[in-house]
Amino acid sequence: MKPGIHPSYGPVVFRDKAADFAFLTRSTMTSDRTVAWEDGNTYPVVDVEISSASHPFYTGTARVLDTAGRVERFERRYGRGGAR
């Protein structure tokens, strides 16, 4: 690798504020704020709005939209448009 052109890559704590969940991983992201982790070391912390701990798809609270009903309602309202 060429020296001096790659960003620094190190441990970072990502904290999901919505789910009160945090995980330690490696990233190129940086932050001025730090947090003491479970292992006793201090790491930079990045707050995120949503993660797998709070996203509806991963938590099983996702809602399925009734697209078939919407299409039928549209066709009733505006008719089946043909070639004009």
Swiss-Prot record:
Keyword annotations for this protein, in alphabetical order, are: Ribonucleoprotein, Ribosomal protein
**What is an example of a Pfam family matching this protein?**
Ribosomal_L31
Q: Which PROSITE patterns match?
A: RIBOSOMAL_L31
Key word Ribonucleoprotein present in the record?
yes
The protein's matches in Gene3D superfamilies, at most eight in alphabetical order, are given as: Ribosomal protein L31
Its Gene Ontology cellular component terms are: ribonucleoprotein complex; ribosome
Q: Name one GO biological process term.
A: translation
GO molecular function terms attached to this record? structural constituent of ribosome
Please give the InterPro entries that the UniProt record associates with this protein: Ribosomal_bL28/bL31-like_sf (IPR034704), Ribosomal_bL31 (IPR002150), Ribosomal_bL31_B (IPR027493), Ribosomal_bL31_sf (IPR042105)
Family per UniProt?
Belongs to the bacterial ribosomal protein bL31 family. Type B subfamily.
Q: What is this protein called?
A: Large ribosomal subunit protein bL31B
